[in-house]
Amino acid sequence: MSFSGRRVSILRPRNASLSAPRGLSDNELRSETHRQFRDAHEGHRPHAGLDASRASTGVVWCTERASEHGYAEDPSGWANLGQGAPEADDGIEGSFPRPESIPITSAAREYGPTAGIKPLRAAVARLYNEHYRQGKESQYTWENVCIVPGGRAGLIRIAAILGNSYLSFPIPDYSAYNEMLSLFKNIAPIPMPLSQNDGYHIHADKIAEEIARGTQVLLTSNPRNPTGHFVGHDELAQIQDICRDRATLILDEFYGGYNYTTDCDGTTISGAENVVDVNQDDVLLIDGLTKRFRLPGWRIAWIVGPKEFVDALGSAGSYLDGGANVPFQEAAIPMLDPSLVRAEMKALQVHFREKRDFVVGRLREIGFRMDDVPQATFYIWLDLTSLDPPLPPQANISDGLNFFNALLSEKVIVVPGIFFDLNPAKRRDLFDSPCHHFVRLSYGPKMDVLKSGLDGIERVIKRARGQTEKPWEDDVAVQDD
């Protein structure tokens, strides 16, 4: 074959799929909503070399579907309870005002270090020592901190520097882990299903069992997205003792400030308190300005861990993301004064607990049992089968995908629970997923948005029960065949 012939065969692929599509179950075939979901995650590649499924996951998929019904043109007219973002305005009593402009020094015009500027790294280390390591001999320094352009960039850097590893992760958990775990071939992902019956608790003996089976890395959010629970201090210390010298523990602590269990006194949650030696314990902590400082647009986050890990993470930044924005790094330094942060966390906890209680109360009024009230984060992990009395079968909105789809008619966005069933190989039948009958609701937005969203949920439930004049067949909700 000539070289030109080979070139044509590459540039003009046949219409056949690059990989044979999996066979759908009868349940999935009968549901158009589920077929749409599969179409977004599997199928042919319209462009050579492009895997389009990686561009449509989790919140992005939900936003794309909402945009088909007008969300992109008028986002302020929607109640977006899907995106995991806290309200970013200055309206929270007791919270410090966010900068409306920042100075740009001459140094900030240059490339910054890929591990972050030293003053910010030192400020993060001081914050952790003041809040979690008082009286301990081993203290964090700037060399134990790597600044990264957002939490997901931090996770990608961590994944890039891991050796060939079995990595265990609980189900359910943060949806973005799914793509990260499937992207890196040095990682063999091992799911660790948790039980709804005991509140998705991560038991220390289960961690010991996973390590005994050969797990070298463990990854989890704590506090936990989407369930709103967390592993408490004593049990987390036990887990860290089990992992010490045996496995690397990665703790995604972005919701550590949203703690409602200590009477909103500003106490935050972190595994840093249980680290014995900051350079020997293989514990990586990820946090940043995004959630608890309510600055998601700044894209300033950090990883705290042993110096050798931090050195490798800084090197990975040179070929992955180039590092975080220097002017925003400089502006972040005064925000990390330990006493200021304590006061900020107290204000945050009081405000978001009030919103949590409002949302839980409204959901109970609508008919959801709400036996499982979140201890942390700003999420409700809503069991659609907990409605009392149950919905009639013909309503067909007792699974997360169809419930999400029905809410589009009310300009309300939630995230179907299926996205938190981390399933990198995409083998599982959607109807077999333990997360299939859940949705995640965020009470991150302002109160008026929460009220609007819950009003929309109530109307959908009433319509499903036949309690409104509007027929169920509307112009948005997709009907099953």
Which positions does each model-derived feature cover?
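Conserved glycine-rich beta-strand-loop-beta hairpin in the small C-terminal domain of fold type I
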Residues: Q349-V360, M370-L387
